[in-house]
Amino acid sequence: MIQTVLFVCTGNICRSPLAASLLERALKERGLEVAVTSAGTGAWDGAPASEGAYLVGLERGLDLSGHRARLLTRELVERADLILTMARHHRARVDELGGEGKVSVLGEYAGRGGDEVSDPFGGDLGVYRDTCQELESLTAAVADRLAAESKRGDQR
């Protein structure tokens, strides 16, 4: 059973912290206890969430004020049971760090094909809203999948 989910993007200041917060909420709504975290392939350790991600998060009832970016490390990859990336190049980096077999591009895992989640960094709030809406849909699908897998595991 999956105990820890790790989201990966580039800077760990936009997409992955939003996705982590959205999945945490979706899992809680489904009664699942799964640790959710995030990291970036090119993150500056300690950087706060971008202003756009922070503001759009607030609009959705998410508080990213305490978020601090983390660089993706082998240790984070080893500790995660499931790693979901925003793009294929992030997946390649996870593979390099030993994550083969437990990494997927988010859209693929959510059953939406191989579409990547585009980076809103530098865009206006409308771009961030579009990204957050996409992440909301994808993370709901992930939560549904994890809930179904958990239910199957309980029946064994």
Enumerate the language-model features and the residues they cover.
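Hydrophobic beta-strand core positions in alpha/beta domains
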Residues: 7, 84-85
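Alpha-helix N-cap/helix-start capping motif
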Residues: 17, 87-88
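Phosphate-binding/catalytic loops
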Residues: 82, 88-156
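Conserved active-site segments centered on acidic
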Residues: 1-79, 144-156
